[in-house]
Structures are given as structure tokens and as C-alpha cells.
Amino acid sequence: VNAQVKFFTDVNSKQIKTLQVKVAGELISEPYIALGGEEQIEINFDGLGSGYTRYAYNVVHCNADWTQSQLSPIEYMNGFQGTTIDDFANSIGTTTQYSNYRLLLPNDDVQFKVSGNYAIQVYNEDTPDQIIFTACFSVVEPVVNISASVSGNTDIDTNQSHQQVSFNINNKNFPITYPQTDLKIFVYQDNRRDNAVTDLQPMSILENQISYTYNLSLI
């Protein structure tokens, strides 16, 4: 995998439909879980055709910008690459034949050792070099508290078409020596990564609180 390629949740095959990546048990949710927690990521998709297809997956650990990290699999996961997806159900009485597949992570075969961004690359076991889709999610460690607010009062207008996003990081239990360089901040609009705001610098740095307020990039 090219280390400079940024991973996105993306489908590369016309045989794959209705891909969903979410927290298991939730109808709609942002795809992130806590490291070592009880929750699981659910990857759900339909594969067109009659009968079971042996789909397998590899786990890729990513940097903050979703490029592949330099960690080796043994450093970020317990288990083996190339595990098959065996939880499936064939369609019954439908015009188009398909099978629904579900993958839960972590599971008995794969567990995460470290937090970070992850990309699951799924392929037909017969053609391992052809990735049919990629599913992205995050595994987090809640070592700081983040409080955020949205205001209609901005430097552009007041209570009209713009809003100001502000947030504070309470790092009382997690010392950060140089927040200007040690922190990588990404602000997404409705989980969109195409217009993410990055490279933010704090407005103020106190002993236990780092504030990002009145930033024009967050309007």
C-alpha cells in the first residue's frame, strides 16, 4: 500500500451495495469506538449474486491524516490479516439475488492494540490484489475532555448564514507540553473529510485547558 494514499470509505466494485460503517447496535452513528471498550464497529454490505462469496479483509492502521502509519500489524493488532467474513444471510424471494454480510470489530480473530484511525480493506479471497471496498473508522482513548459550542454571532455576520465553532480541551489528566505541535486537530462538517479544517492553533493555553475560540477557519 502506498503510504501517501489517504484512505476513505469507498466502494470499488459494482457487486457491492449499501455499505454501512457504524457502531454496532446503533441505527446511525459516527464510526468510532473506545480502545478496550465494549462497543464494536459494524461493517454491513450486500454482495450481488447467488450464494456465499468468500470475502476476506486486511486491517490497516492510519495516521491522523488517514495515510498508512509506519506501525507493523503485530504492533497495532492481535490476530491475522486475511480473515474471512463468515456472517452472512442469503436473500429470499427478491427480484435481485444477493447476500448480506456483516463484520464486527473487534472480534475473536482481530483485536486492536492501539488507538488511531483504521481502514479495513475487503477483497474476494480468489483475487486478493483487487480491493472491492474500504471501510474507515476510529478507535479512541478518551484521555482528555472536549467541550464544544456553536454560536450564530460571528465576525462575518450575526444570526444569519454563518456559525462560529469553538471548543476547549481539558487535559488535566494528560499533560501536553507543546500543544501547538503535539496536537493534530481535525474539524469535520457532518463527518465530511473533503472540507476538513486542519492546522488549527490554540487561542489560549492554560495549565489544564487549551482553547480554540474565535478562529476564522471555524466559521
Which residues does each PLM region occupy?
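Low-complexity, Pro/Ser/Thr- and charge-rich linker/hinge segments at domain boundaries
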Residues: 8-10, 139-162
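Aromatic sugar-binding surface patches on proteins
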Residues: 84-87, 92-106, 205-219
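Short, aromatic- and glycine-rich surface loops/edge beta-strands on solvent-exposed regions
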Residues: 57-59, 116-122, 218-219
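Ligand-binding face of N-terminal immunoglobulin V-set domains in extracellular IgSF glycoproteins
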Residues: 95-125
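Contiguous beta-strand segments within globular domains
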Residues: 13-61, 157-171
